[in-house]
């Protein structure tokens, strides 16, 4: 019996080669799922790092702005893909659409809604790929378990056909079956961990973008209030300007 066990190739590759076609398909599918997981991890990690660093730099520059026009001048150098520039454009577009309106509170409310929608859209865009991670993490163990059950069934069939319980006959089939479960766990565990890490990063990034949106809304609100004050007290404002 010992010689038979030694002659049986119980390496990972050997067990794969001797596995049933169904178990092989399960293993290949799980390996492909693992490859997808790590591809998403590396691509999204680079994306998160670049976007976060860029947004942080833009936020620091916009903190020096004292009006919406000044912020637009600063953001002109950010590039067309700048998220901060998109937020400023939303505020500017609402001002242009509401030109002639005296309802400053309505303008602020509509701008706030626009900015919230933009932040939510960015969050959805940053979350692309997380659905695959969640699916892989949820179903991989069960797919591996299916391969294990199928392999054990084949082992029992082999026992019945050979009419022996010799360990040399039983062990290889069971080992091949358990390999499917192991690969399923190898695919699922990183997917779940990476999904949770990305979920936290997306939440943090949306918070940073929300701070920029609040800064844009603050600048717009200040501009509207100053314009309203200038219209209500033109003489006082003119005196202050001359005094300055």
From Swiss-Prot:
Induction note: Induced 2.4-fold by hydroxyurea.
Protein's cellular compartments: Cell inner membrane
- What is one term from the GO cellular component aspect held by the record? transmembrane transporter complex
Q: Which domain of life is it from?
A: Bacteria
The transmembrane residues are: 16-39, 128-155, 162-194
Biological process according to GO: bacteriocin transport; cobalamin transport; ferrichrome import into cell; intracellular iron ion homeostasis; intracellular monoatomic cation homeostasis; protein import; protein stabilization
Where are the Periplasmic topological domains? 1-15, 156-161
Q: Name one GO molecular function term.
A: transmembrane transporter activity
- Kindly give the InterPro entries that the UniProt entry links to this protein: ExbB/TolQ_transport, MotA_ExbB_proton_chnl, TonB_ExbB_1
User: Which UniProt key words apply to this protein?
Assistant: Bacteriocin transport, Cell inner membrane, Cell membrane, Membrane, Protein transport, Transmembrane, Transmembrane helix, Transport
Cytoplasmic-facing ranges: 40-127, 195-244
Lipid bilayer topology:
Multi-pass membrane protein
- Assembly information from the UniProt record: The accessory proteins ExbB and ExbD seem to form a complex with TonB.
Q: What does this protein do?
A: Involved in the TonB-dependent energy-dependent transport of various receptor-bound substrates. Protects ExbD from proteolytic degradation and functionally stabilizes TonB.
Q: So what family is this one in? A: Belongs to the ExbB/TolQ family.
Q: What is this protein called?
A: Biopolymer transport protein ExbB
What gene codes for this chain? exbB
């Amino acid at each position: 019996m010992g010689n038979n066990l030694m002659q049986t190739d119980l390496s990972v590759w050997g067990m794969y080669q001797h596995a049933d076609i169904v178990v092989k398909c399960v293993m290949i599918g799980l390996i492909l799922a693992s490859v997808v997981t790590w591809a998403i991890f590396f691509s999204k990690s680079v994306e998160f790092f670049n976007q976060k660093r860029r947004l942080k730099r833009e936020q620091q520059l916009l903190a020096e702005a004292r009006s919406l026009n000044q912020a637009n001048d600063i953001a002109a150098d950010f590039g067309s893909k700048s998220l901060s520039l998109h937020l400023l454009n939303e505020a500017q577009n609402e001002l242009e659409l509401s030109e002639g309106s005296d309802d400053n509170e309505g303008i602020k409310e509509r701008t706030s809604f626009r900015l919230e929608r933009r932040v939510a859209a960015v969050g959805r865009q940053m979350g692309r790929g997380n659905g695959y991670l969640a699916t892989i993490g949820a179903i991989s163990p069960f797919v591996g378990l299916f391969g294990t059950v199928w392999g054990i069934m084949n082992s029992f069939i082999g026992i019945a056909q050979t009419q022996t319980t010799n360990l040399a006959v039983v062990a290889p089939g069971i080992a091949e079956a358990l390999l499917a479960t192991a690969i399923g766990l190898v695919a699922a565990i990183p997917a779940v961990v990476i999904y949770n890490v990305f979920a936290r990063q997306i939440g943090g990034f949306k918070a940073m973008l929300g701070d920029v949106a609040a800064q844009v809304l603050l600048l717009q609100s200040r501009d509207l209030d100053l314009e309203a004050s200038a219209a209500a007290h033109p003489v006082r404002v003119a005196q202050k300007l001359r005094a300055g």
